[in-house]
Curated annotation (Swiss-Prot):
Organism of this sequence: Kluyveromyces lactis (strain ATCC 8585 / CBS 2359 / DSM 70799 / NBRC 1267 / NRRL Y-1140 / WM37)
Domain Rab-GAP TBC: 58-319
Segments for region (Disordered): 1-24, 467-491
Principal location class: cytoplasm
Keyword Cytoplasm listed: yes
Entry superkingdom: Eukaryota
Pfam family of the protein (one): RabGAP-TBC
Name of the protein in its database record: Oxidant-induced cell-cycle arrest protein 5
Keyword tags: Cytoplasm
Segments forming a coiled coil: none
Protein's cellular compartments: Cytoplasm
């Protein structure tokens, strides 16, 4: 006779089920509140608040086709652009550097064939199998979109694979054609023999809310161009290469970003850093391509569409203090003070739900009060020295200036924020990666497991009335990582828990902020020692 499960086991299972149901219900209630808020901000053209909410809470998937164009329209890297050049390259000859120009020398037919090969990898098309008319039309639309970009920017940027994969990633959230909601279903997710799916069927939204959305003023190609300007942004090229390896608050070039990533990775996760660098994940050009997708292409091809969408929410919502724009974009000659209103227009209740301690996630004690680019604070080293001066224990000679009702601006350049998000993802998967063989590590780096399962489930179910327990909540809720201190508590920084538990992208995002503060404090200690 089979044994019956103990009553205590059944009770525990019921408690977990009720806990999961309650947690999902609360999340779905908040998601509905977010949808209403975003629609309100869109109709008021309150793009500053829109950016603040997007980078801290994420954009509901249903609304990305409406929200992303507005975020891009007012993005500083779109208004004052400068992108990584693959036509201008420094050549070092016997310690003498020279900037050389390598224009595109491939024919349009050759480039078109390269695009076709990249598209076939996404759609899993084999040469021996006829391509459906639907896929052929989509491929043509995407190629034309990239061609439009290249015709405009070809002196700076010639074709590389990332351009087509950015277009594919955008098409997973924004329709290729105006006035419909058909988006790409994602790799390996063809839907009813189609590579397209209706966004509002996958992520439902009531008609009365949908009808309130303003018409977008950009077509897909215009959104794509602006997105590339953000993802491929780089500091202006000088006549001589920048030998500095210190680029944190400011943006660095691709090589400097890679150096920063490995520096933070090595300090934060030394036990994991060693096997990953030793076991071949960085050896050989093919094995190291994951770095290109992670850093330059901001998650294209390697992150699931849900996680990549959330990462792009962060990048597109980046907004620094208007008077400090030139600190981050040194080449800029435009004024942003009339574009970005300083006053916070969100209600206090909503603001404290989004910014729980009145900061962006990447905050640091006293950094908000500094006027970067002014008063001798022109380089990252200047800022670090000033932070050290202000944060000495027992230094009562300074009080942090705060302005009431001011938007908490972004303090770290968005591409550096992305690097800390990646380190948080590695930390979340540390135990698993330590047990992996070399081939498994390489597979992980090229196909990062889905993080946003809980978020995705609740955005899909938030307007349903049926059971909301969900299959994505089998684990207990993560322990709170402590309340983040206000900027007046000098250097009393919470580094977060180390339980490797993440139930949503928000957990990873918060952990990334904790890693940033802990690492910045270590940098300051090294500065003091030097």
């Amino acid at each position: 006779m089979p044994l019956k499960p103990s009553s205590s086991h059944s009770e525990r299972k019921n408690r977990l089920h009720l806990h999961a149901s309650s947690r999902n219900a609360k999340q779905q209630e908040w998601n509905r509140e977010l949808v209403t808020l975003f629609i309100k901000l869109l109709n008021e053209n309150d793009h500053a608040s829109l950016a603040l909410v997007a980078r801290n809470a994420g954009v509901p998937p249903q609304l990305r086709p409406a929200v992303w164009p507005t975020l891009l329209k007012y993005h500083p890297m779109v208004i004052s652009p400068n992108i990584m050049s693959n036509t201008l390259v420094f050549k070092d000859d016997e310690n003498e550097a020279e900037l050389r120009y390598f224009p595109e020398d491939r024919s349009e037919e050759d480039i078109s064939e390269l695009m076709e090969n990249d598209l076939n990898k996404y759609f899993q098309v084999r040469n021996s199998v006829p391509v459906s008319a639907e896929i052929q039309e989509i491929k043509s639309l995407l190629k034309e979109c990239v061609w439009q970009f290249l015709r405009k920017w070809n002196k700076i940027c010639k074709y590389e694979s990332g351009l087509i994969w950015i277009a594919l990633g955008l098409a997973e959230w924004c329709p290729l054609k105006n006035n419909d909601d058909l988006v790409l279903a994602g790799r390996k997710h063809h839907h009813h023999n189609s590579c397209l799916r209706h966004l509002y069927e996958e992520y439902p939204i009531p008609d009365e809310l949908l009808n309130q959305l303003p018409d977008t003023e950009f077509d897909f190609a215009a959104i794509y161009e602006r997105l590339v300007l953000v993802l491929f942004h780089a500091p202006a090229l000088d006549e001589k290469p920048d030998k500095s390896n210190y680029h944190l608050l400011k943006s660095g070039n691709l090589n400097q970003q890679s150096q920063l990533f490995f520096k933070v990775f090595a300090k934060t996760l030394p036990e994991l850093y060693q096997p990953i660098t030793d076991e071949g994940a960085l050896q050989g050009s093919k094995k190291a391509t994951w770095l290109y997708w992670w850093i330059k292409c901001c998650g294209c091809r390697v992150l699931h569409r849900q996680d990549r969408g959330r990462v792009w929410d962060v990048l597109l919502g980046w907004r620094p203090r208007p008077e400090s724009i030139n600190y981050y974009l040194e080449y800029n000659h435009k004024s942003f003070e009339s574009i970005y209103p300083p006053e916070l227009k969100l209600s206090s209740e909503i603001f404290h739900k989004i910014c729980k301690c009145e900061h962006d996630e990447f905050w640091f004690p006293d950094l908000m009060s500094l006027r970067l680019g002014q008063n001798g604070l022109n380089q990252d080293e200047d800022v670090i020295r000033e932070l050290i001066r202000r944060n000495k224990y027992g230094d009562d000679g300074h009080t942090t200036e705060t302005q009431e009702n001011e938007i908490p601006y972004s303090l770290l350049n968005p591409h550096a924020e992305l690097l800390f998000i990646y380190v948080a993802i590695m930390q979340h998967n540390e135990f698993k990666l330590l047990e992996f063989e070399e081939t498994e590590i390489t597979e992980f780096l090229n196909n990062v497991p889905l993080i946003s399962k809980f978020d995705d489930y609740n955005f899909k179910k938030m307007y349903e009335d049926d059971d909301i327990s969900g299959s994505s909540t089998d684990t207990d809720e993560s322990n709170a990582s402590g309340i983040r201190p206000s900027s007046s508590n000098h250097m009393m920084i919470e580094v977060g828990t180390d339980d490797k538990t993440a139930h949503s992208f928000d957990d990873i995002y918060q952990q990334a902020g904790d890693i940033w503060r802990n690492w910045a404090w270590q940098e300051m200690e090294e500065f003091i020692e030097e």
